[in-house]
């Protein structure tokens, strides 16, 4: 079975078994809702166990999560640095024009027929996602995921067609 990263446990939060998680999922409310089952992987990417979410809340840039059956800091301290993943069979079907991060990362970005680079990361700074495009011999390009810029996402051909607005590429 294939698993996809949804967050990394970066620290404990208080004494009641809560953990500070740095989320890397595109559907936070769905992934961390009460009753959701996630897989826990250690620093060597080895499966440890399935865990059930008992509670979730946001605090600044972190998701604060508590696992069912783990109610004290001593129960969870050993999991700092571990990764939370979702099984592929738990992914929901998406509407047209919506994508999971793992589908977008690695796609080639083209303006016309020219390959600009490959998407290496997705940022969520505000209203729109920003795709980080790794380019050969140039600085990374920050590409806003908005209709005038991203014209087409073709998953079957591993290709994103874009039109760079003036000022987006400061190296031209």
From Swiss-Prot:
Binds ribosomal protein uS19. GO terms for biological process: ribosomal small subunit biogenesis; rRNA processing. The keyword Protein biosynthesis does not apply. It comes from Streptococcus agalactiae serotype Ia (strain ATCC 27591 / A909 / CDC SS700). This is Ribosome maturation factor RimM. The gene is rimM. It is found in: Cytoplasm. Keywords: Chaperone, Cytoplasm, Ribosome biogenesis, rRNA processing. Its main location: cytoplasm.
